[in-house]
Amino acid sequence: MFFVDNDYDESLEGISPDLYETPCYSIENLYAQKEVFQDIIQAEFGINQAHEDYKRCIDDYEKRCEEFVQGMEEFNALAYMRRQKTDSNSDVKFGSVKTSHLFDISVHQIVKSSHYAEEIEKIKKALDVTDTELTDSIKKLRILGDPVVKYRGKNQLDFFCSLLKQLKEYNNSGGYFSVKHNCVKLNITGNRLSELSQYALTPESLEAFLHSHFVLLAS
């Protein structure tokens, strides 16, 4: 069995029955989802759905998520354009651009970083992109569907984890939650995919893929 991220490449679906391609940009997108956030607030913060703090957390997450994906449109359009031009990563290393160099992320607002313009201009120059080409790429990107699913997963998960970490800090310092929640177990490090794996969404297509292969192995 082989697992690959879709990225912005042409779909590999159907090439081999042993190949599974993510239905989103990458595996990280399966973590950075509202449903996952809801589960973590309940399980790791010990806040049930009936509590006023739960509603506040979810409301703020939804607002900040919308702001973040709107802000990341230009960056993702450039990443999409690079994939259309070449499958080489030699021109621009999108993965090396820190999300914190694009946006300052907080529970209260999403603001462009002071480095944003510099980072975007460097990419545009490296790709030799015109404003017209960028506009066309943005239009094509919008057709792909939900940005939370189709935008670069690493950046989406950076945003997701930043909010969770800040909520944990606010629980310790006060000023956000109505009460201090004493059962917060959340700990996110550089090993975040493993640490949050129990909460990640499992697409139906992945369940079907695994089931079919387990049946073959058992036969």
Question: Which residue stretches match the model-derived regions?
Answer:
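Acidic, divalent-metal-binding catalytic cores of TOPRIM
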Residues: 1-219
